[in-house]
Amino acid sequence: MSRFWSPFVKDLVPYVPGEQPKLARLVKLNTNENPYGPSPKALEAMRGELNDNLRLYPDPNGDRLKQAVAEYYGVTPAQVFVGNGSDEVLAHIFHGLFQHDAPLLFPDISYSFYPVYCGLYGIAFEQVALDEQFQIRIEDYKKPNAGIIFPNPNAPTGCLMPLQAVEELLQANRDSVVVVDEAYIDFGGETAISLVDRYDNLLVTQTLSKSRSLAGLRVGLAVGHPDLIEALERIKNSFNSYPLDRAAIVGAAVAFEDREYFEETCRKVIDSREVLVGQLQAKGFEVLPSAANFIFARHPQQDAGELAARLREQGVIVRHFKQPRIAQFLRITIGTPEMNQALLDALS
């Protein structure tokens, strides 16, 4: 703490990111990165940007990427916002759309950055308890609010809210912005982007860090009504007009255009997930239904924190959350078959 800090800084509780170990020998199953590399076509496109044009600023609007996203989802570029990772996109959403008199609503078990943003921007919030199956109860969100946000599939549980239920939540909150955080949607869910033309209060966020294997590039997006997008553009241009570099814009656009590679890698992750679920269940683990590139599991005879520590000693890193209701679960990223086997060997 320093006497030069602004007063609010001392009360901030920052987000704690997953460990990025320096040792290459570790099997990394803790931060939900894709075990398969980016699209070769995207890599080639990015290499093409590494030239003298780097002396020039990138397109502040990211139009090439917006067009690719719009074509992929059947929307217009005016309905698309792009930013430096979905975390930055979410930060702009909290800043630009959730600062109202009523509290913001989100699940008690969800992305741990949400309360951090609320603290940063002075937003009142209420964490609404998921049911015993870790699902949202629509009735719990039928009350005054400044907005609603939730991850779908949920993080860290991996549980999916069906699109019909998402629409029911939208219908019950026509006077509030509803943000569906779809970081993991491509691994088993149906995107809510199909609803944006019917609901002017819907905003859907996605990332290229998971299903498109570009976590190191930092690219995120939002799709919604042009009026909501305009609010984000105003915040962005009051903060950083150039959030995406030249290589990121082109590489992310090509990642959307290369559908064949995208579908192939998603299928491999999904297939590996289903195999690993069965293998863990055979070892006595309870595994929650997952539509993500990770699973949430617990063993009735093993303390989760101790198990995570023992796995790390054997070179396998998984994620353990010390918080109510889920302290006995481990979140395990789906790796290649070889990485998953290393986990199973360590458990044995």
Swiss-Prot record:
InterPro entries on file: Aminotrans_II_pyridoxalP_BS, Aminotransferase_I/II_large, HisP_aminotrans, HistidinolP_aminotransfase, PyrdxlP-dep_Trfase, PyrdxlP-dep_Trfase_major, PyrdxlP-dep_Trfase_small
Catalytic activity, as annotated: L-histidinol phosphate + 2-oxoglutarate = 3-(imidazol-4-yl)-2-oxopropyl phosphate + L-glutamate
Example of a GO MF term: pyridoxal phosphate binding
Gene3D superfamilies reported for this sequence: Aspartate Aminotransferase, domain 1 (3.90.1150.10), Type I PLP-dependent aspartate aminotransferase-like (Major domain) (3.40.640.10)
Protein's UniProt keywords contain Transferase: yes
Keywords attached to this entry: Amino-acid biosynthesis, Aminotransferase, Histidine biosynthesis, Pyridoxal phosphate, Transferase
Top-level class of the enzyme under EC nomenclature: transferase
Single Gene Ontology BP annotation: L-histidine biosynthetic process
Pathway stated in the Swiss-Prot or TrEMBL entry: Amino-acid biosynthesis; L-histidine biosynthesis; L-histidine from 5-phospho-alpha-D-ribose 1-diphosphate: step 7/9
UniProt xrefs under PANTHER family: HISTIDINOL-PHOSPHATE AMINOTRANSFERASE (PTHR43643:SF3), HISTIDINOL-PHOSPHATE AMINOTRANSFERASE 2 (PTHR43643)
Protein name: Histidinol-phosphate aminotransferase
Lineage of source species: Bacteria, Pseudomonadati, Pseudomonadota, Gammaproteobacteria, Pseudomonadales
